[in-house]
UniProtKB/Swiss-Prot annotation:
Positively regulates the cynTSX operon, and negatively regulates its own transcription. Binds specifically to the cynR-cynTSX intergenic region. Induction: Negatively autoregulated. InterPro entries: CynR_PBP2, HTH-type_LysR_regulators, LysR_subst-bd, Tscrpt_reg_HTH_LysR, WH-like_DNA-bd_sf, WH_DNA-bd_sf. It is found in: Cytoplasm. Its main location: cytoplasm. Gene3D superfamilies: 3.40.190.290, Winged helix-like DNA-binding domain superfamily/Winged helix DNA-binding domain (1.10.10.10). This is HTH-type transcriptional regulator CynR. One of its GO terms (biological process) is regulation of DNA-templated transcription. PANTHER family: HTH-TYPE TRANSCRIPTIONAL REGULATOR YBHD, NITROGEN ASSIMILATION TRANSCRIPTIONAL ACTIVATOR-RELATED. Keywords: Activator, Cytoplasm, DNA-binding, Repressor, Transcription, Transcription regulation. It comes from the Bacteria. Pfam families: HTH_1, LysR_substrate. GO terms for molecular function: DNA binding; DNA-binding transcription factor activity. It comes from Escherichia coli (strain K12).
Length: 299
């Protein structure tokens, strides 16, 4: 049995079709079918029920799928371990973050990491926390940055920093003369907020309901840059981490009293998994960067 057999089996199981799996794998359907038959012969059981209009896993196939997935993860980890170099003269790092971190934290962190380790290939993606956790568990990422609490028991969460949400307005907004306003002022503000798929929006809605607040949400946007551009050009306001405003000209972050929401950012990685030298270096640099960010926010 070869790793190719495992890859082919998992592809057919995922797509529920030899045709779609063959297309995804860039192989011919007859070649794929032959490899699956070889696998079934080596195991001595049929893995797929081919009697219906769609391909379905047999009971034996369902059981073997769990072991096949874990085996593929271990093979991938082993390959990375072989190519891992402790002096960081080569290697790769797969990172995913929730979108609010990109402008004020991940951008500077990635720039510093690249400057120190230019031979490390970096892959950075923005996505929801749910997807980050899922991809980490499937060994499709090395590290993720999101928020506590973490839902998957397979993941370790290392605290990075605690951030507060602030009322962010344009410099020409009437409230921009204030450093702090009462939380109750949100009743009077017309807000631009991130859309519901963002963890930040989910947290805002939860805490507003808990505090008995009913802000006027007049625009929803599915990107941070769109929200910030609308704030710059209008008299609307938004709720975002205060640090984001410091990275963009023409914006002012106003603290709320009492604070609407404080949340802990965490670095996520799989428990008991091989950590490459690049992943370890990234963690140490992230912790150092967070100490600087936290110090700036406290002033």
């Amino acid at each position: 049995m070869l790793s190719r057999h495992i890859n082919y089996f998992l592809a057919v199981a995922e797509h529920g079709s030899f045709t779609r799996a063959a297309s995804a794998l860039h192989v011919s359907q007859p070649a794929l079918s032959q490899q699956i038959r070889q696998l079934e012969e080596s195991l001595g059981v049929p893995l797929f029920d081919r009697s219906g209009r769609t391909i379905r896993l047999t009971d034996a196939g369902e059981v073997w799928r769990q072991y096949a997935s874990r085996a593929l993860q271990e093979l991938g980890a082993g390959k990375r371990a072989i190519h891992d170099v402790a002096d960081l003269t080569r290697g790769s790092l797969r990172i995913a973050v929730t979108p609010t971190f990109t402008s004020y934290f991940i951008g500077p962190l990635m720039a510093d990491f690249y400057a120190r380790y230019p031979s490390i290939t970096l892959q950075l993606q923005e996505m929801s926390q749910e997807k980050i956790e899922d991809m980490l568990c499937r060994d499709e990422l090395d590290v993720g940055i999101a928020f506590a609490p973490v839902h998957s028991p397979e993941l370790e969460a290392i605290p990075l920093l605690t951030e507060s949400l602030a009322l962010v307005v344009a410099q020409h907004h009437p409230l921009a003369v204030h450093e702090q306003v009462a939380l109750s002022r949100l009743h009077d503000e017309k807000l631009v907020l991130l859309s519901a798929e963002f963890a930040t929006r989910e947290q805002i809605d939860h805490y507003c309901e808990k505090a008995g607040l009913h802000p006027q949400v007049v625009i929803e946007a599915n990107s941070i840059s769109a929200v910030l551009e609308l704030i710059r050009r209008t008299s609307l306001s938004t709720l975002l981490p205060a640090a984001i405003a410091t990275q963009h000209d023409g914006l002012k972050a106003i603290s709320l009293a009492p604070p609407l929401l404080e949340r802990t950012a965490v670095l996520l990685r799989r428990k008991n998994s091989w950590q490459t030298a690049a992943a370890k270096a990234f963690l140490h640099m992230a912790l150092d960067k967070c100490a600087v960010v936290g110090g700036n926010e406290s002033r």
